[in-house]
């Protein structure tokens, strides 16, 4: 694969204070301080975080649609689509299962809930009833049927990632099958990609404001002190996720010829955004763009990233088995090996419906415990207060897992420019887009 060289010299480095990751860090620190010292006012800033996430969700559907359609329509052989999808699902299934097992093993070794001796009958279940009610709406058949939208337009109106993915794949295949007659449509969609991604860049400038509001609300409402009683569970989850990313995914990255630490550094701005908003979905458009810049083919990025947001949730899977066994230990429920295998199997299925939105992990945990009656659902009240703090770690782990999956599947498919990947991870790749000249410097375009 040929690497095109920039037409001119690279622009001067952007000062650190103008870089997104620095601005997000400052916003998170200021938001945390405000939440601690002025909790009442900080709680009122929740709309800032919510508004930013809504802005990002607004652009996700067009980004996914354009990336997938132009990628598939540009493929020489349509068999490639099925092959990439099959490889992606194989990867997702293996590592999702591994994450569930890791969470279960850590729960047995660390025993975070041992000695609490909680009586489930004495717990206030009213706080978790909302989540349990939502979890009853989750089922495998319902999840699969929900992938098919009521109309082509409703997929975009509802912003359902899997529905948009479904429509985009079908439209991309149809566009490829009509051949030259579809060339004008493909050219239009490729031209439309530029302003859509420019809009993504514009929205990302509001990331510090969104992160500030979200973290201020979190600290103001729940307080840092709410972590103390369940610090052992929270600490176990963070350390387990760190182990999964640095060791397990680190080994995978090393076998594929790159460093997971360099990948994390490459995605630092997006990771800080995910940290501030507790939603991996907030950085989805940027992740897709950066994976293309890192040498992954557009068609692979368009299929792997959106699919991974529902099927490759490593952080959520670790959380589900760890939290379920914590509740079992805290309520003195001794699970047999068969019951634990059942728990793992149910968690595997229920986790597939959890998209990268805040609170999805807690809902899928409720779905799992509702199906496995051995662990009391009322025990979820024990972790409700600290679940919001574990949400950040879930989202970060999910995000990194999907970035690694994109590179691995691209390499597996021989659709990875390794030289470009090295340049990007070393910080030597050209910027995502060239600076836009002022209006008076734009030359008129002659008609062709």
Swiss-Prot record:
It is found in: Cell inner membrane. InterPro entries: C4_dicarb_transport, Na-dicarboxylate_symporter, Na-dicarboxylate_symporter_CS, Na:dicarbo_symporter_sf. Signal peptide: none annotated. The lineage of its organism: Bacteria, Pseudomonadati, Pseudomonadota, Gammaproteobacteria, Lysobacterales. One of its GO terms (cellular component) is plasma membrane. Residues 428-448 are annotated as: Disordered. GO terms for molecular function: fumarate transmembrane transporter activity; malate:proton symporter activity; succinate transmembrane transporter activity. It comes from the Bacteria. This is C4-dicarboxylate transport protein. Residues 432-441 have a biased composition (Pro residues). It is a multi-pass membrane protein. The chain crosses the membrane at residues 20-42, 51-73, 88-110, 138-157, 161-178, 198-220, 230-252. It comes from Xanthomonas campestris pv. campestris (strain ATCC 33913 / DSM 3586 / NCPPB 528 / LMG 568 / P 25). Belongs to the dicarboxylate/amino acid:cation symporter (DAACS) (TC 2.A.23) family. SUPFAM superfamilies: Proton glutamate symport protein. Its main location: membrane. Responsible for the transport of dicarboxylates such as succinate, fumarate, and malate from the periplasm across the membrane.
